[in-house]
Amino acid sequence: MASGSACTAVKIGIIGGTGLDDPEILEGRTEKYVDTPFGKPSDALILGKIKNVDCVLLARHGRQHTIMPSKVNYQANIWALKEEGCTHVIVTTACGSLREEIQPGDMVIIDQFIDRTSLRPQTFYDGSHCSARGVCHIPMAEPFCPKTREVLIETAKKLGLRCHSKGTIVTIEGPRFSSRAESLIFRTWGADVVNMTTVPEVVLAKEAGICYASIAMATDYDCWKEHEEAVSVDGVLKTMKENANKAKSLLLTTIPQIGSMEWSETLRNLKNMAQFSVLPPRH
């Protein structure tokens, strides 16, 4: 167990995906509109607590779901959460299953990604007038925080949720869904699920020295599976509505556990990795 001072240093950012951005999970909610060097985040930051753990909720696509995946300001979102003092970011995301055993309604605690995006800034060090100075070559062998993932996995087991302890997610540009040929190719690559938002979010969190973990909720079998209805907006929303309480339950139980743990070494290692990955400009 952590000491009292260590506990107060933990603040959890929650980025809610499609159907999973309900602010009601927070107690004592207040709204805070912020700006960043990269522009405005997707919406107001919702500040509050989950069982005495400070939390900040952000709707990835905006509270009215008006921002498509390619247009989400991922840089501003992560920057804003970092500036607000978040040590951790736990995100939820809808995804399509590429594996028979990952059924609609199942959760996957992602451990790897494949990037198929093409239009999104992936670094805070992008050479723009507002960017940090230098060039960052952040290691990505372990994109997601293993310690945070382990807490999510163990909590899901205790809650009796259908949850897969690892999975590789392929992030596509969107907003369209995959073709059948693409879906079949992703399977041969070893991908387990497909979505539109994990990259560059996870990369930017790593650059920011934040413990980042993702709860992926399978809503469908994408379109690779014969004799199965292909993914559709209606189907995704229906499954998310039916299963949103599972993700809420996992967050509400996991976050107090995270708040009771010692994170100083983990956070120090992440900070050092981020710092030593930057090549400063020559003078």
Swiss-Prot record:
InterPro entries reported in the protein's UniProt record: MTAP (IPR010044), Nucleoside_phosphorylase_d (IPR000845), Nucleoside_phosphorylase_sf (IPR035994), Purine_phosphorylase-2_CS (IPR018099)
The EC number(s) this enzyme carries: 2.4.2.28
Catalytic activity: S-methyl-5'-thioadenosine + phosphate = 5-(methylsulfanyl)-alpha-D-ribose 1-phosphate + adenine
Binding site for substrate: M196, D220, Y221, D222
Top-level taxon: Eukaryota
GO cellular component, one term: cytosol
Pathway(s) served: Amino-acid biosynthesis; L-methionine biosynthesis via salvage pathway; S-methyl-5-thio-alpha-D-ribose 1-phosphate from S-methyl-5'-thioadenosine (phosphorylase route): step 1/1
Annotated PROSITE patterns: PNP_MTAP_2
Pfam families: PNP_UDP_1
A biological-process GO annotation: purine ribonucleoside salvage
Described function: Catalyzes the reversible phosphorylation of S-methyl-5'-thioadenosine (MTA) to adenine and 5-methylthioribose-1-phosphate. Involved in the breakdown of MTA, a major by-product of polyamine biosynthesis. Responsible for the first step in the methionine salvage pathway after MTA has been generated from S-adenosylmethionine. Has broad substrate specificity with 6-aminopurine nucleosides as preferred substrates.
NCBIfam families: MTAP
Protein family according to the UniProt entry: Belongs to the PNP/MTAP phosphorylase family. MTAP subfamily.
PANTHER family attached to this UniProt entry: S-METHYL-5'-THIOADENOSINE PHOSPHORYLASE
Protein name as it appears in the record: S-methyl-5'-thioadenosine phosphorylase
Protein source organism: Mus musculus (Mouse)
